[in-house]
Amino acid sequence: MFLLYEYDIFWAFLIISSAIPVLAFLISGVLSPIRKGPEKLSSYESGIEPIGDAWLQFRIRYYMFALVFVVFDVETVFLYPWAMSFDVLGVSAFIEALIFVLILILGLVYAWRKGALEWS
């Protein structure tokens, strides 16, 4: 007898939800025709024949802007639930959120001073 009988539905759901994608990939692999040709090996750019080399070097500045964007995007994700329940949480949660924002502002000032936000 299974000791955690109340989890039977959970395990059944987990097994079924794991089996469905595996079966979908197996069935599509078995039923799909395999045709290799020059068109399958070429790059696809919105229906236009690609011109030039597909491998481009990106400047490191794009990386720095993306990194700063991700940091502040994650900040927004963390602050949104706090803002929705601001009136319930009280002063201690406000002080914690204020400390969180101040740490992120310090990080922004540091990145600014290091020149991470300058495009030159």
From Swiss-Prot:
Superkingdom classification of source: Eukaryota
Topological category with respect to the lipid bilayer: Multi-pass membrane protein
GO cellular component term of the entry, any: chloroplast thylakoid membrane
Record-level GO BP terms: photosynthesis, light reaction
Transmembrane segments: 9-29, 64-84, 88-108
Swiss-Prot/TrEMBL keywords: Chloroplast, Membrane, NAD, NADP, Plastid, Plastoquinone, Quinone, Thylakoid, Translocase, Transmembrane, Transmembrane helix, Transport
Function statement: NDH shuttles electrons from NAD(P)H:plastoquinone, via FMN and iron-sulfur (Fe-S) centers, to quinones in the photosynthetic chain and possibly in a chloroplast respiratory chain. The immediate electron acceptor for the enzyme in this species is believed to be plastoquinone. Couples the redox reaction to proton translocation, and thus conserves the redox energy in a proton gradient.
Family label: Belongs to the complex I subunit 3 family.
HAMAP family given in the database record: NDH1_NuoA
Subunit structure: NDH is composed of at least 16 different subunits, 5 of which are encoded in the nucleus.
Designated name of the protein: NAD(P)H-quinone oxidoreductase subunit 3, chloroplastic
Native source species: Olimarabidopsis pumila (Dwarf rocket)
Gene designation per UniProt: ndhC
